[in-house]
Amino acid sequence: MISSIDHIVLTASDLDKTIAFYCDVLGMTLEDFTPSDGGEVRKSLKFGNQKINLHNAKSPFKPHANNPVSGAVDICFLSSKTMEEWNNIFSENKIEIEDGPVRKTGATGPIMSLYVRDPDLNLIEISKLFFLTKACILDSILKISAFKLFLA
């Protein structure tokens, strides 16, 4: 049975730009590794317990996807930072926010998300788990009740 994802592969048209975006903007760590077959040294981006292996679009490592192209990925990353902090980071780096913050449904429940594009125009969703506290729920109920009274 499948229990988790170990890594994914990202095909990049310009490794330097890709590394700068994921490391300098998103805060991932660049790591070099040598495959167990002793092949060419490769690069990966580490974050948490996961990693993204990088393939150069001009010469992807084998084996590789049937049609390895850059710009075809849509991925969601979970973060401990607030949406306001991410908004500031993207603003400082002159990265346009395509959408958000918006509430979405993630693998483990509600999330708040911002959407941006990486240098290859992959869709990058940055999310924070969204917990409804009792105070937040009560506040929403009171606002709805007040609005209903206003309409009556």
Language-model features: where?
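Vicinal oxygen chelate
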Residues: 1, 4-13, 43-46, 64-141, 149-152
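Core segments of cupin and vicinal oxygen chelate
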Residues: 11-58
